[in-house]
């Protein structure tokens, strides 16, 4: 699956029409590819934290999205990665609704986020999560945001997803 379900260790409360920026630890994986000229085929993905590797289902059992699931802690800044296990991702949370909201998770396609490394440290492209109304339903638009860094960018050979939204079962 290309989707990641990050469950925060602390709930983030956003009052109406407010925003917050947080840093979270995000699990990393190593991809093994077969490369023949311009043809690239992924053979396997190996998680760097095999003891905590889980999958979760976002949505109903019959139509939900299978996700790589991780319970993540808040990081202090972009350099707070756990060497060879977890990188750091910046998430900007915007609440454009007329009421306060609590955010405890985010689901997104990881193929939209590049990974950068320097020695044993890792950072990932960030996310912008916008809580808003679409007709009568509250949704969370999730978009990838490139990080500005001089760290080495890891090669990317997977397809990307244009945009995503999740219904507000935000809890």
Where are these regions (language model features)?
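Interface-prone segments of viral and bacterial extracellular assemblies
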Residues: 1-171
